């Protein structure tokens, strides 16, 4: 690929300060080195995979069920896009808060399925995530389909056509 765009130029265009900082840190001098990353993958990932395998077997589970996010969605009004969120009474990084529940399964290679579960009193969506055993994708899809057949229909989202970025 002969792209003339640099990683620094891409990072400069990220509008959310928290996400911009996260990407900048990944490419800074303090970033995890390839050797450190490889060591973590080789040493720690198999341990985490085994912990998940044990949890499924010891508890005779077909799936682990968690909220997709630890807090409900928030309004994407332009005025609050870059603010932090409150989690357990404390200010927390928006991106990390909203991705923390869904990261674990993907990091260990487990199939996961996030499905809209309902709406808050304010009409904002909440989701539920089903995490399956390794190589049990079809079983997980069946579980998701069964859940969807029991869940009441949800209204279509209202689309906010306001720009999310201010230049």
Segments from the language model and where they lie:
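Short helix-loop capping/hinge segments that flank enzyme active sites or metal/cofactor-binding pockets
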Residues: 1-53, 67-71, 76, 116-117, ...
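A short, structure-level motif marking secondary-structure boundaries and short turns
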Residues: 36-38, 85-88, 129
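A generic secondary-structure micro-motif detector
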Residues: 41-42, 90-91, 133
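Generic recognition of flexible, low-complexity loop/linker segments
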Residues: 50-55, 100-102
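Active-site charged/polar residues at nucleotide-handling catalytic sites that mediate phosphoryl
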Residues: 59
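Conserved acidic residues
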Residues: 62
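Short, surface-exposed loop/helix-turn segments at secondary-structure junctions
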Residues: 74-99
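Structural helix-boundary/capping segments
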Residues: 94, 101, 106-167
């Amino acid at each position: 690929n002969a792209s003339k765009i640099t990683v620094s130029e891409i990072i400069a265009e990220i509008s959310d300060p928290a996400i911009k900082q996260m990407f900048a840190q990944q490419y800074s001098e303090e970033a995890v080195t390839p050797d450190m990353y490889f060591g973590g993958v080789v040493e720690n990932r198999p341990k985490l995979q085994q912990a998940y395998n044990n949890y499924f077997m010891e508890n005779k589970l077909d799936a682990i069920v968690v909220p997709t996010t630890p807090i409900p969605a928030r309004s994407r009004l332009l005025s609050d896009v870059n603010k932090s969120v409150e989690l357990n009474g404390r200010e927390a990084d928006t991106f990390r808060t909203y991705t923390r529940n869904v990261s674990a399964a993907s990091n260990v290679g487990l199939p996961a399925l996030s499905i809209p579960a309902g709406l808050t009193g304010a009409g904002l969506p909440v989701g539920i995530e089903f995490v399956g055993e390794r190589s049990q994708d079809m079983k997980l899809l069946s579980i998701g389909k069964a859940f969807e057949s029991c869940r009441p229909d949800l209204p279509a989202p209202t689309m906010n056509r306001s720009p999310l970025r201010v230049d």
